[in-house]
């Protein structure tokens, strides 16, 4: 089958689909599938833009809202992962993946699905060592720290992916696997991106977590983006168990701009007789069920179970029996239901609302999947955790939880001791760099981290001390039995969707990233400091004038001709 691969989307769906149509007519082919490697920007309305980690000058509605509202429908089945410029409040509704619009599917924090028998997996976000060992604790309204940390990948998701034993055909990450540049034309890469030389020569460019997954999964194809350059590589893996060594074809593509290599069609062998619809992957769903109790919505460090004598179980790979149980849970039907529904009002160009506050809601797709497989909605779990932590004075966790979550972590080195992701001295002038390049201004509009607009659909579940057994914790039980409003019957409706129940939000996350807001330090194994109630009060008082606007240092770098072209 013909698979179109896109680098960074940046919300330019109209242009991408037009480019695919042009290639189809030019080459006489029919594209079966589009894969987008992050920075998708599924922005539904003006409120979503305030939950996207880009400076205000780069916040543009683009064209996704047309596909969300039903004005248009994607002409090609589209699958995407998240990057570091996303409408995070939208994607957090779908931690296990789901439809963001008809015919457009998000893979979630991590996921594996099937199309025409081809196994397609992905990992959303980018790697930052200081957040890697934390749980998915972020919950809107975001503060300036969580607005960035929310898209950092976590070891729980990497751990789940490392339980996969069956072959993967295609895998996607936003940032590159560390070291992959040594398997392609490195000199040509450095001629195009001279600022990468230091990190390439020191083998510190890219994600060590992705490199770990590349070694474990050894997929046939690996697609990435992030660096805004086309680069291909061919990696031969070491032979295992007396079998022939596997080969991974790596391809990274540019962002969607004129005269840039942002799209390429790849021919992938499908499996005759396989379903023409997207399908769940039984092995992956069995892994999700097995690891459900490992979810910890905390900003304290957590290490996955290991065969070190401290854990009763460390292998969460899927047995044949577990996979058959998943198939039974789905009543034998692996086809992913086309159950998209609106959860917030779409953008209306005739009635712009530039001061609209972000809206937050649970998603019926996630609720349905969790009910079917008895999974925990990570988004709700984080929200419940935020409520509990907020009522404890914003300290982030009790002493018991802190002790439990940091066991085996506080005194251990990083999983990737060579990681220098916080020490990168190079910058990509072609990238809208957010990490630690923000400076505050005195005046500013309302942002997602301000803590206003507390009208999200969030469960009010029982609040109390957590038991040591996480299976019986109030927040987990509430997360599993939350009853959602009925989804919209049509993709486009006259009603403004204000009929959705509105419940109180927890306060903004009290956890503070270990990296400085000015310059990220190297990864340390120190325990995450807690914020005292006094600090929380002071922070809240400082926000009464509205969340400060953000600007970058070195603005002159971003006035390149290509950016002017993109603005036009």
Swiss-Prot record:
Start-end of Low complexity biased regions = 534-549
Q: How is the cofactor bound?
A: Binds 2 divalent metal cations per subunit.
- In its UniProt record, which GO terms are filed under biological process? mRNA splicing, via spliceosome; RNA splicing, via transesterification reactions
**Residue numbers bearing the Phosphothreonine modification:** 478
Segments of this protein annotated with the region Lariat recognition loop = 124-154
Cofactor(s) annotated in UniProt: Fe(2+); Zn(2+); Mn(2+)
Basic and acidic residues bias (residue ranges)? 467-480
Q: How is its activity regulated?
A: Active in presence of diverse metals including Fe(2+), Zn(2+), Mn(2+). Also activated by Ca(2+). Binds two metal cations in two adjacent alpha and beta metal-binding pockets.
One Pfam family recorded for the sequence: DBR1
Taxonomically, the superkingdom here is Eukaryota
Kindly report, in one word, the top-level EC class recorded for this enzyme: hydrolase
Residues that coordinate or bind a divalent metal cation 2: 39, 84, 174, 226
**Region Disordered, annotated ranges:** 388-568
Instruction: Please provide one cellular component term from the Gene Ontology annotations of this protein.
Output: nucleus
Q: Which UniProt keywords apply?
A: Hydrolase, Iron, Manganese, Metal-binding, mRNA processing, Nucleus, Phosphoprotein, Zinc
SUPFAM superfamilies for the chain: Metallo-dependent phosphatases (SSF56300)
According to the UniProt entry, which residue ranges have a biased composition of type Polar residues? 417-428
Give a short account of what the protein does: Cleaves the 2'-5' phosphodiester linkage at the branch point of excised lariat intron RNA and converts them into linear molecules that can be subsequently degraded, thereby facilitating ribonucleotide turnover. Linked to its role in pre-mRNA processing mechanism, may also participate in retrovirus replication and have an antiviral cell-intrinsic defense function.
Which family does the similarity line name? Answer: Belongs to the lariat debranching enzyme family.
Q: What is this protein called?
A: Lariat debranching enzyme
- What organism does the UniProt record list as the source? Danio rerio (Zebrafish)
Instruction: Provide the organism lineage as a comma list.
Output: Eukaryota, Metazoa, Chordata, Craniata, Vertebrata
- The gene designation is dbr1
């Amino acid at each position: 089958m013909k698979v179109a691969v896109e680098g960074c989307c940046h919300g330019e769906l109209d242009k991408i689909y037009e480019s695919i149509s042009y290639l189809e007519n030019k080459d006489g082919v029919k594209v079966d599938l589009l894969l987008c490697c992050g920075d998708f920007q599924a922005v539904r309305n003006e409120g979503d833009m305030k939950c996207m980690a880009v400076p205000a000058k780069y916040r543009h509605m683009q064209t996704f809202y047309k596909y969300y509202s039903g004005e248009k429908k994607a002409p090609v089945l589209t699958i995407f992962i998240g990057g570091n410029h996303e409408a995070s409040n939208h994607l957090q509704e779908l931690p296990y993946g789901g439809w963001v619009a008809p015919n457009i599917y998000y893979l979630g924090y991590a996921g594996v699905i099937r199309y025409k028998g081809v196994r397609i997996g992905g990992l959303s976000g980018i790697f930052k060592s200081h957040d890697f060992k934390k749980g998915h604790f972020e919950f809107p309204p975001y503060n300036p720290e969580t607005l960035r940390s929310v898209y950092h990948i976590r070891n729980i998701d990497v751990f789940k992916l490392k339980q996969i034993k069956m072959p993967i055909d295609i895998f996607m990450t936003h940032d590159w696997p560390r070291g992959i540049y040594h398997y392609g034309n490195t000199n040509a890469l450095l001629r195009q991106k001279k600022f990468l030389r230091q990190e390439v020569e020191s083998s510190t460019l890219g994600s060590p977590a992705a490199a770990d997954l590349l070694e474990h999964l050894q997929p046939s194809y690996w697609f990435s983006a992030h660096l805004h350059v086309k680069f291909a590589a061919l990696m031969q893996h070491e032979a295992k168990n007396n079998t022939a060594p596997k080969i991974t074809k790596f391809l990274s593509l540019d962002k969607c701009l004129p005269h840039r290599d942002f799209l390429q069609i790849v021919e992938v062998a499908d499996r005759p007789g396989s379903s023409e619809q997207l399908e769940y992957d039984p092995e992956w769903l069995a892994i999700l069920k097995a690891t459900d109790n490992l979810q910890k919505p905390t900003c304290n460090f957590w290490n996955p179970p290991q065969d070190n004598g401290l854990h009763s179980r460390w292998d969460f790979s899927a047995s044949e029996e577990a996979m058959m149980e998943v198939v039974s849970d789905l009543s034998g039907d692996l086809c992913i239901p086309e159950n998209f529904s609106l959860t917030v009002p779409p953008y209306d160009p005739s009635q712009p609302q530039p001061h609209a506050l972000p809206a937050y809601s649970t998603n019926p797709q996630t609720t349905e999947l969790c009910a079917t497989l008895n999974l925990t909605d990570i988004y709700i779990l984080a929200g419940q955790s935020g409520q509990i932590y907020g009522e404890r004075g914003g300290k982030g966790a009790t002493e018991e939880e802190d002790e439990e979550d940091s066991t085996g972590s506080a005194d251990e080195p990083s999983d990737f001791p060579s990681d220098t992701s916080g020490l990168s001295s190079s910058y990509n002038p072609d990238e809208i760099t957010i990490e630690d390049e923000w400076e505050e201004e005195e005046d500013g509009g309302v942002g997602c981290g301000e803590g206003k607009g507390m009208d999200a659909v969030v469960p009010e579940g029982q609040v109390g001390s957590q038991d040591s057994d996480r299976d019986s914790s109030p927040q987990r039980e509430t997360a599993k039995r939350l009853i959602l409003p009925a989804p919209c019957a049509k993709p486009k409706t006259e009603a403004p969707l204000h009929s959705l129940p509105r419940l109180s939000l927890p306060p903004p996350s009290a956890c503070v990233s270990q990296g400085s807001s000015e310059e990220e330090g190297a990864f340390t194994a120190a325990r995450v400091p807690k914020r005292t109630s006094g600090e929380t009060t002071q922070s809240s008082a400082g926000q009464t004038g509205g969340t400060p606007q953000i600007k970058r240092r070195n603005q002159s770098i971003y006035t390149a001709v290509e950016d002017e072209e993109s603005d036009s």
